[in-house]
Regions:
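Immediate flanking context of iron-sulfur cluster ligation sites
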Residues: 62-70, 80-82
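Cys/His-rich microdomains that often coordinate metals
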Residues: 78-79, 96
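Cys/His-enriched microdomains
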Residues: 70, 87, 105
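Short loop/turn motifs enriched for small/polar and acidic residues
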Residues: 31-35, 64-68, 108-110
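Short cysteine-rich clusters marking metal-coordination/redox-active sites
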Residues: 72-75, 89-92
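Long, charge-rich boundary regions
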Residues: 21, 29, 105-120
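Short Cys/His-rich "knuckle" micro-motifs
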Residues: 82-85, 99-103
């Protein structure tokens, strides 16, 4: 299960950024492509488990799923791919292996916890 090692890498990166900025992380926002080879539910479970006893304990992993989009050389256009069975243009049927998006595994944002102001 490589999702655990991915979750641990995400946590390590977020902790390093939190340390550098002196903040607490409330959520990690991630783009996850359909063709990334990562199981969304497994990654969510692994993230929750791996956060225990870290600075990110209690934080959330927010995943934006990125669909597959191909470029068709015949149409000279990008098209979302609705079936993973055939990598063909949905408009003209031309086979295409040029994937424009859908392989992402990218941390795009860290949501910082709001701290209550110190009352004097």
């Amino acid at each position: 299960m490589h999702e655990l090692s991915i979750a641990m890498s995400i946590i390590e990166m977020a902790e390093e950024e939190a340390d550098n900025r002196g903040v607490q992380i409330d959520a990690v926002h991630l783009k996850l492509g359909t063709l990334s080879g990562v199981a969304r539910d497994a990654l969510l479970s692994c993230f929750e488990m791996a956060c225990e006893n870290t600075r990110l304990q209690g934080s959330r992993l927010v995943i934006e799923e990125v669909p597959v989009v191909i470029f068709c050389a015949s149409c000279q256009a990008q098209h979302p791919l609705h079936s993973m069975q055939l990598f063909c243009c949905p408009e003209c049927g031309t086979p295409s292996s040029e994937i424009v998006q859908g392989k992402e595994l990218e941390v795009v944002a860290l949501e910082i916890k709001e701290c209550a102001p110190n009352l004097v």
